[in-house]
Amino acid sequence: MDQEIERVVQAIAIASEPSQSTLFQEALNYIQGIQENANETWRLALQIFVATNGDQGRKYPPQARFWALRVLEEFLENKFDPLDPETFQTLQQAMMSYIQSEYVQGPAEANAPFIRNKFSHTLTLLFLCTYIDQWPSFFTDLFSLIQPSSQSSSTGLNRHISLLFFHLVLEISGEVADQMIKTARTWSAVRHARDGRVRDAVRERDAARINEAVLTIVATNVERMNALKEGDGDSQELGNSIELVDWGIRTFGSYVGWIDINLTVTPTTVPLLFKLLADSSLPIRLATSVALLRIVAKGLKEPADKLQLFKVLSLGQVLDALESKTAKQQRERGDDVDEGEESYREALGKLLNVYGLELTKLVEDAPTDDIRSDASAALVDLQPVTLRFLADDYDDTASTVFPLLQAVLGSYKRSRKVSSGPIDDQKRSFLSALLQVILKKMKWDEEAEPDDVDDDDNGEFEKMRKELRTFMDAILTIDQDLVTDEVRKLALQTISAYQSGTSLKWNDAELGVYLVYIFGEINKSGGKGRAAFCQTPAVIDKDKRKVTDYSEFPLTSHGEMLLALVQSGIVSYPNRTVSLQFFETVTRYADFFKVRKECILPALEAMIDKRGLHNENQQFRIRLYYLFYKFIRESRHEIPSQIALTIINSLPDLLSINVQLSEPEDPESDPLTEAVKSPVFESQLYLFETIGILTSTLSKDTEEQGNLLLSIVKPFMEELLANLQLFRAGSQDLVPVVKVHHIIMALGNISKGFPDHPASTTSENYMAPSFKVFAEIAQAILVCLEAMNVIKPIRDATRFAFARILATAGPTVTGYIPPLMNHLLAHFEPSELVDFMNFISLLIHKLQKDMFEVLDKLIAPLHSHITAILSQAASGTDELRWQIETKKAYLNLLVVILNARLEGIFTSERNSASFEALLGSLLRIVEDVSDPPSQKLALTFFGRCVTVWGQPAGSPNPELGGNLPGFERFIYEQIVPTAFGVVALPSFNPKDGQALMVIHEVASLLQTVCKTRGSEAYDYFLSAFLPSKGWPAEMALDFTTKLRDLDSKNFRKYFTELIRASRSS
C-alpha cells in the first residue's frame, strides 16, 4: 500500500499545480477516480490522513491529507445504516488516536488550520451513521479528553479539544436541524428519518451533558477573560478566552432550537447571556444575539409557556437599554463609521423583530384573554424601541424591524375592518409616531448624489422609499385623515419656508415636493380629473365642461398644495433633484393646470430654461424630454397659439441631431444596428413629437400652421439630402446612414404629434397646407429608401415614419404606399414582412375607404409573395416559426380588409381572376391541423366572406353585404364540407386547448351560414349534407334544430360535446 500511497500523494501534488506540469490532467483523472471509488479506497485515504513520522508529525503534506478527508466524506456521506464492525472499529480507533495525538498532545493542525474544519465535518458524518447503534459513547469519549493538560493548565480545560467539541456540535446541529441546509440539499426520506432518530437519541442520552459542557467551558472562559481584562493580562491568553466564549455561544445557539428549553433557559444561563450581549467583544455580542434570537423563536406547544419564557427573559427592557446605549455611542462617533458596531445594532434589531413577531403570534392565537392581554401589553411596550430602530440612519438596521411593523399594521387593519369606531388613543399615538419616522426616513441623505445613475446607494434609497410607502399606505387604510393631514402639513410648511426665504436643505426641499407628488395616491377621497383639484358641483354636463370656468371653484387640499408649489418658485432651488421632482409632480397632475391656467406659463418657463430642457446635465435633460412631452400633450388645449409659437422658437438648439459612434459591447454585433440604438436620441424623439403637438394646436390658421411646419422640417430634409448624397458617393462612414435613420425617425415623430386624420372632415381644406408638407416629407423619405433599401434600420425607420404620416395626412399621401411597398419588399428579413402586413392593417383601420385603390394594387402581388414563402419547406425551427407568423399576419390582414368593408378589392377587375385561387389556398390552411391559430383565422375569414357575399338575392339589408353570383354554391360545396371535415380528421385532437378554438370557430361559421342563407341552409343541412355523411334522420334534425335555436355560446358548447362524443364512440 505504501507505494500506492506515494503515487497518490504525488498525483495530488501534480493536480494542485495545473500550470506546472503536462501531467496535470492525467493526475487529476487518477485522483478523481480514487475519490469516486471511495467504498474501496477509503482505507488508503485514512492512512494518508493519520500517518505520522517518527517525530509524531504528520507524514503527508496538508493538501494530500485534505484530499484524503474528501474521500472519507465521500465514503460516509450517504451511509444511513450501521457500518460493518471491522470498518467501524478501524475508523473509530484511527479517529480517536488522531484526536489524542493531534488535539490533546499536539498542536491541533496549527500549520494547516483549514484541516480542522474539514476534520470536524468528516467526524460528524461518522457520528451520524454510528451514534445510534455503534458509538453511543461518542460524547463520553470526547468529554474524557477535555481535561487539564500541561499546555492548558491555566484554564483547567484543553482548549483544542474544547474548540473541536464546539465545531462538532455545530456541524451536528447543522446536519440534523438546520432547515436552510436541509432545503439546499436534495430531499431524501432515508436521510430525513435518520436525522430524526439522531436528534431523538441525542436528546435522550447526551443533551444535558452537552449543554453542561458547553456552558462550563463558556463560564470558565468568561471568568478567565474578565480577569485578564481587569489585570491587563497576556493578550494571547485573552484572545484564546474570547475565541472559546465566541465559539461556545455559537454552539449553544446552534442547539437551543432542538433540545429541551429547560436545559438552555435557566437562572444561570439568562444572566450569562445578557452579560455577554453587552460584552466589549463584538464577536461574542453577535453570537449571543443569535443565540437569544433562536431561544425566542423556539416553538413551544403551550402559549402560556412561551409567554412565561418572555417574562423570564424580560427582553424588551434589555433591548431598550442596549438600543439607547448603542445609539448614544453612534452619535458620539459622528462621521467615524464603525461597521462592526453597526452590525451589532443590526443584530439587536433582528432580535427585537423576532421577539415582536412572536408576541404578535401570541396576541393573534392566544387561547385565553389573559395571555392575549399580557402579550399585547408587552408588544405595546416594545413600540418605542421599534420606532428608534426604524429611525436608524443605516437602512440595513432600520429594515430589520420591517416584518414586525408589517405584522402590527396588518393586525390594526384587520381590527379596523371589524370595527368602524374611533381608533383608541394608544394606537393613534403609535401610528402618528410611526408616520413621523417614516416621513423622516423618506428623505435623501444630505450627502447623497442622486444625479449619479451608477451609484448603488441611490437605488437602495429608492427601494427603501418604496418600502416606507407600503407602511404609509397601511396607516392610510387605518386612519386616512392622519396621513393626509400630516403629509399636507409637512409639504406646505416646506414650500412656505422656501418661499419666505428660510434656509432649507436640499433633501428637505425634495421631500416637500415629493409629498405633493404622492398626495394624489394617498388622498383616496379625492375626485378624478379636474375634480381632484377644485371643488366642482356634483355634476357638470359633458357638453358644458369645455366652457366651464373652473377658476371660479375653490381648490381642494391637493389643488392648494400644487398652487403653492408652483407659486413658491421652488423649482429654482439650486439642486437638480429638487427641480426634477417638481417637474415629475406637475407632469403627473396636468389636470390641475386646467383649473388654474395661470400656472401653466411659470411651469412651462421652468421646463424650457436652464432649470429644465436647457440644463447642462444630459441625464437630467433626457428625463425632461419625456416629462415636457407629457405635460404638453395633456395641456395642449390650454396653451394659447402665441405661447405655442414662443415655445417652438425656444427649442431649435435642442433639435440638433448628433451622432456619436462608440465601440459595440459585443464584438459579434452589427455596428450599424448598435449605432442606431442611442438612448439619448430615443429620448430626444419625445421632443420632436412635442414639436408636432405644439404645431398642431395652430389649426385655426392652417396657412400659418403649414408655414411653421415647413420651417421646422425643411432643415431636416436638407440634412437628409446631404447625408443621402454622402451615402451615394460611396462613403464607408456609418455616420451618414445613422443620420438618415435618425432624421426619418424625427420626422415620423413630428407627424406623430399631429392628430389622426378624421374619418370624415367638414372641410376639404382641413389642414391642407400641413398635409402638403407631409407629402413632401413622404417623398423625401421615399427617395432615401429607394437608395438605401438594403439597410434594415432604414427600412424600419421608414415603416415607422410612414405609419405616422399616413395616419395624420390620410388620403393626401396614400399614393405613396405602392412604391413604399416595392422598396420595402425589395430587400427584407422575415420579421419585416410580418411588420409590413401589420402596418397595412393599421392603415386600413385608420383610413378605411381611402385604402381601396392601394389595396387593389397590393393584394395580388402580396398573395403571390406569401404563397411562394409558405410553399417552401422550412429548413429549421426558426424558419418554421417565421412561416407561421407570416401566415397569421396575412390572414389577419385579409380579415381586416373584410371588416373595413373593402371586399371589393378581391372581386375588382384587377383581382377577380385570382380570387378563386386565393379562396382555395385559404381552404388548405383550414385543413392544416398542425397550425390551429391559423386554422381559426382562416375560418374567421370565411365567416366574414359568408356575411359579405353570401346574402340571398334581394336581401333587405344591404349594409350586411351583397350577393356574389355563385358564391352560395361555394359555401355549400367548399366551405361547409371543409369546416366539417377538419374536425373529423384522424389527426385532429378535440381535447387539445388550441383545437378547441378551432371547434368553436367552426361552430360560429356554421351558424353564420344558417343566419345568412336562412331556411335554405337549414334544409340543406337536414336534407342533403348531414344525410350524405351518414347521419340518422333524428340526429340530423336535433343538430339542425340546435343550430337554429341556440345562441352562439350554447351552440359552441353543444358542438364541442358532439365532436368529442363522436371521437369516443
Swiss-Prot record:
Biological processes annotated in GO: tRNA processing; tRNA re-export from nucleus
One GO CC term, this protein: cytoplasm
Keyword tRNA processing on entry: yes
Entry keywords, A to Z: Cytoplasm, Nucleus, RNA-binding, Transport, tRNA processing, tRNA-binding
Subcellular location: Nucleus; Cytoplasm
One MF annotation (Gene Ontology) recorded for this entry: tRNA binding
Domain of life: Eukaryota
Main location: nucleus
InterPro entries with a match to the protein in the record: ARM-like, ARM-type_fold, Exportin-1/Importin-b-like, Exportin-T_C, XPOT
UniProt key word Hydrolase: no
Gene3D superfamilies recorded: Leucine-rich Repeat Variant (1.25.10.10)
PANTHER family in the record: EXPORTIN-T (PTHR15952:SF11), EXPORTIN-T/LOS1 (PTHR15952)
Similarity section: Belongs to the exportin family.
Functional note: tRNA nucleus export receptor which facilitates tRNA translocation across the nuclear pore complex. Involved in pre-tRNA splicing, probably by affecting the interaction of pre-tRNA with splicing endonuclease.
Protein name per its UniProtKB record: Exportin-T
Organismal lineage: Eukaryota, Fungi, Dikarya, Basidiomycota, Agaricomycotina
Gene name linked to the record: LOS1
